[in-house]
Amino acid sequence: MSEETLSKKQITRLNKLQKRLRREVGSAIADYNMIEEGDTVMCCLSGGKDSYAMLDILVNLLQRAPVNFNLVAVNLDQKQPGFPEDILPAYLDSLKVPYHILEKDTYSIVKDKIPEGKTTCSLCSRLRRGTLYGFAQKIGATKIALGHHRDDIIETMFLNMFYAGKLKAMPPKLLSDDGANVVIRPLAYSREKDIAEYAELKAFPIIPCNLCGSQENLKRAAVKEMLKSWDKQFPGRIETIFTAMQNTSPSQGVDRDQFDFVSLKQDPDAPMKGDVAESDLPAFDFLDLANSGHIDLDAAKRSSDLLKIDVVSTYTP
């Protein structure tokens, strides 16, 4: 499929997806101040649907963004067997985007360290990340753009909860441990299914990600299936989960490193409250015997109203 052969219905759908993805990327960039005046953004291109979509949207953003920035695409050829070396250069030449194709045989390292049949993705990604971080410094890139989307972020949170005992995900913007690189994820607000459909309609020249023969990450696959089931059974739940991730309250949690529970003390000089809402009352019941329900103390301003209140279950020694 190519854009020239799309039906009228498909073109309409493509335009709708394009507007949605561009809007979401623009919002994510603005919310997290991902791209600033004079930045050089190194767009990491793997050949998968996500990185293609990210590059496509960032190229468009170059022309209309309120700030001036430079964009350079970078692909790391990790010497996996069967990797088509001509696809990405041809595609990037057609876009007229500056790019670098790096070569580093991390495949041999991974095969040497990981037993046959085991998932190699974790080690492979760490080696790839180290190479890309170093190259970003070499070319003076101020931001490293990765193609992780909203589903990746949510899946990572549940993986860490279930298997690592941590409430930790992928931040839309990250400073590397050594402080040398800033990583951004412009697709942080975008759904994987929208990206997949967009990539198909745009006919990106996708390169398979399993050329190495690695087994699928079964834990991530299980979490992905769980979220897919929730999305089908409870529409809106995934959106609510992501919203919750943006609205954390350390004082209402149990992590002592995030909030100083140990030092919490009552303030003896705190002013006494006059009229109080029912939610602020101590742990005994105020009952309105007239209607056998709770009475609104804020509405009970007259003394005759207050006579209706019967205080129960109190004790004075």
Swiss-Prot record:
Compartments (UniProt record): Cytoplasm
GO BP annotation list: tRNA thio-modification
EC number(s) on file: 2.8.1.-
InterPro entries: Rossmann-like_a/b/a_fold (IPR014729), TilS/TtcA_N (IPR011063), tRNA_Cyd_32_2_STrfase (IPR012089)
Keyword annotations of the record: 4Fe-4S, ATP-binding, Cytoplasm, Iron, Iron-sulfur, Magnesium, Metal-binding, Nucleotide-binding, RNA-binding, Transferase, tRNA processing, tRNA-binding
Pathway: tRNA modification
EC category name: transferase
A GO term from the CC aspect: cytoplasm
Cofactor(s) this protein cannot do without: Mg(2+); [4Fe-4S] cluster
Reaction(s) this enzyme catalyzes, per UniProt: cytidine(32) in tRNA + S-sulfanyl-L-cysteinyl-[cysteine desulfurase] + AH2 + ATP = 2-thiocytidine(32) in tRNA + L-cysteinyl-[cysteine desulfurase] + A + AMP + diphosphate + H(+)
Cofactor note: Binds 1 [4Fe-4S] cluster per subunit. The cluster is chelated by three Cys residues, the fourth Fe has a free coordination site that may bind a sulfur atom transferred from the persulfide of IscS.
Main location as per UniProt: cytoplasm
One Pfam family hit: ATP_bind_3
Motif (PP-loop motif): 46-51
Note: The thiolation reaction likely consists of two steps: a first activation step by ATP to form an adenylated intermediate of the target base of tRNA, and a second nucleophilic substitution step of the sulfur (S) atom supplied by the hydrosulfide attached to the Fe-S cluster.
Quaternary structure, from the entry: Homodimer.
PANTHER family recorded: AMINOTRAN_5 DOMAIN-CONTAINING PROTEIN, SULFURTRANSFERASE-RELATED
Function summary: Catalyzes the ATP-dependent 2-thiolation of cytidine in position 32 of tRNA, to form 2-thiocytidine (s(2)C32). The sulfur atoms are provided by the cysteine/cysteine desulfurase (IscS) system.
NCBIfam families: PRK10696.1 (NF007972)
Protein's UniProt name: tRNA-cytidine(32) 2-sulfurtransferase
UniProt organism field: Shewanella loihica (strain ATCC BAA-1088 / PV-4)
Name of the gene encoding the protein in the UniProt record: ttcA
